[in-house]
Amino acid sequence: MKIVPLRSLPTLALATLLTALATGCASTEKKDPVLDEPADDDAQESVLPEEAETDEGVFHVHRHEEQLWFEIPAPLLGRDFLLVSRIARTPSDLGGGFFAAGHKTGEQVLRWERVGERVLLRKVSFRNVATGDDPIQVSVENNNFHPILAAFDVEEEGKLEGDPPTETVLIEVTDFFSKDIAAISGLSASMRKTHEVKRLDASRSFLNHAHAYPENVEVRQTLTFEAGNPPTDAATKTLSLEMNQSMILLPEEPMRPRFADHRVGWFTLQRTNYGLDAQKSATEELIRRWRLEPSDPEAYARGELVTPVEPIVWYLDPGTPAKWRSWVKRGVEDWQAAFESAGFKDAVLAKDPPTKEEDPDWSGEDVRYSMVRWAASEVRNAMGPSVSDPRSGEIIESDIVWYHNHMRSYRNRLMLETGAANPLARSLPIDEELLGEALRQVIAHEVGHALGLPHNMIASASYPVASLRDPAFARKMGVSASIMDYARQNYVAQPGDGLEGADFLRRIGPYDHYAIEWGYRVIPEAETPEDEKPVLDAWILAKADDPMYRFGAQTSSPTDPRSQTEDLGDDPVLASSLGLQNLERVAPKLLEWTASEGEGYGDLEELYGELVGQARRYLGHVVSLVGGVYEDLKATDQEGRVFTPVPKEEQQRAVAFLAERALATPTWLLDPEILRRISRGGEVDRVRSMQTRILHQLLDPARLRRLVEDELERGEEAYTLTELLADVQNAVWSVPSTPYSRGLQRAHVERLVWLATEESAGGVDLDTSDIRALARWQLERMKELLESQPDGLAPVLEAHAADLVARIEHALEERPD
């Protein structure tokens, strides 16, 4: 195409950037711009130097030395672009090490608009809308004015050859990409504070390249900041990173959205639709999903499996170690079976990226391509983020990240959770095939997120504990009805149960097939999202009575004992009992299993510390029964309650278990053969810390408030606050006196003092509740018992009693009734 300048405008300085934000990058073949001679004698020469290099794409990108211009076709003025900012190269430990190469730092919808001799860049929001032709649309627009992020002078007008020719405007965007624009710099306010970022050093910052593609523009920039506390090389006082800005043209016609339903788990976008006749400003939720359309709609309508017009493709990071590549690919493509439930075959693919010889312009930062990135980082994590069109929920792109050191997490947990029954997990390094299978399932979990699925924490509770010990069941069904649960390894299977290798691991389950079908199956007879609702609702009701198809969202403080993290099975007490039995078998073997000739005891110390944490986690699963409330998600046309308190008998059983396994001294954790190899001491504090955590969870104000409220409704059928306080006191004080038991008794008094003196905690008004009154009452009775101890006690016991009496008196005097 030729650029035909119509009229060059007086060159003005680039208008002030009003705030901060982003823009994109891209790539195709470079060529010198070909300019026709001006037809108008008054026309000035083009502002573009003859030496400028041009990339042709969604719009033209011109580059000369450190200057950058965008030539935007007039039809694209007013169109919506999605700008994605991503770290391309990063110093180690940026933001604590979580911000690896490929990490998305921002996304926003932008719109270019021409006003007179300037082009404005606006940030556009779709949070408030009015669908249809309702007159309120005018009010929505007037009350949701989009901010102007930057303004650019029109440097030149031109035309692109065509029939008819396309008018264009030329703007210089150099400053936008070379200055410190906070929203596209990759450094959040918290990171700037942490690393004491002072200013951008322009002399060490520059544009790497800019490329145009048919749908997007990509700009790569190197930014160097003066920083008082850089993440690495502190003496340099310098923080440098490479950012990639992707600006992709969104479809002119958005994908048909699908409305969310809280009974099926999906990541969602929320919008307030003022056009609905709901007698209120009604909130709508759209699920986030990829655009999957059948290549043969007629065959699809007949119920045949068909390929999608465009499959979902993830490319493997070229930096992925060779021995793990096949496992990563399998983790991606394991979702193919779930999409067959939605009527699609070969819907999800994993591919190697093209070589430089095959496609010199291919880039993993190009927003058109999704990747599974392998981050060389000490962080132990993985994640599956995605970028979506806020108008419809259509997922545009996703970069899954596996942090290299996450191998360490699974190496350790396979040994601790399965080593008792799994010979492949009894030495370091762990069997490579077993670790590869674990990697495969983690990748599948993160792909699930990238497909639109959130965590489903209730899924593991649908499997009976006994079934998890059955090799045939475990081999077919895994450990949970959904791979989106935090249920990683089968820790309940016992030696002799017969499970082998991958039988101990999770896998894509029946809920995942159901959720993918619910979100991705095309409903041919529906013409609008509203038309889909009765069909979607019928699919939910058809599964409503089967626990395998329940959804339980992840929360910071779950009250449903079935919706815990890292738990297994339908009986927390039994599952935790079996898990602890396995840990008791593993603990004395750690010295042998972690031994390596010529090495120290670093692995032993690490594994022992994580074993203690795993035991604490199992005990926490049981705590959740106390004051627990089952939550069964329903719509108004379904019978029954949503919230049901856990039966009294189950709560009493849980407290009895905790009295035996948590509040009694866990002597099995005190093996001197291990402790004297990793520590000079500190066992008493270690045990006290573990027991105190369980004690605090049991006597959590929100939990205690639920007990008070449950007694109001159920009376004698409820497990009461008075009963819990009595049961805990009996467990803590009815044991032989040792440094361990005395430490727990002090913790018990401290917790009661806290309940008796704090005004509020965790949203609970302690000052006016029965919790405070009963805590004070129990402290007073405890004081009487301590003061009535017989004479002749050992000095340490007498001192212990006197100390606790003094603590109680001080608390009650400082905060009298």
What positions do the PLM features span?
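Bacterial N-terminal signal peptides that target proteins for export
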Residues: 2-13
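Solvent-exposed, polar/charged alpha-helical surfaces in well-ordered, non-transmembrane soluble domains
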Residues: 326-333, 337, 437, 441, ...
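Auxiliary tRNA-acceptor-end handling modules of aminoacyl-tRNA synthetases
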Residues: 27-320, 338, 342, 347, ...
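Hydrophobic helical h-region of N-terminal Sec-dependent signal peptides
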Residues: 14-19
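Conserved catalytic/binding loops enriched for acidic/polar residues
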Residues: 460-817
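C-terminal motif of bacterial Sec signal peptides marking the signal peptidase cleavage site
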Residues: 21-24
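The catalytic-center signature of Zn2+-dependent metalloproteases
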Residues: 352-375, 437-494
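Sec-exported extracytoplasmic/periplasmic mature domains
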Residues: 333-344, 448-449, 453, 489, ...
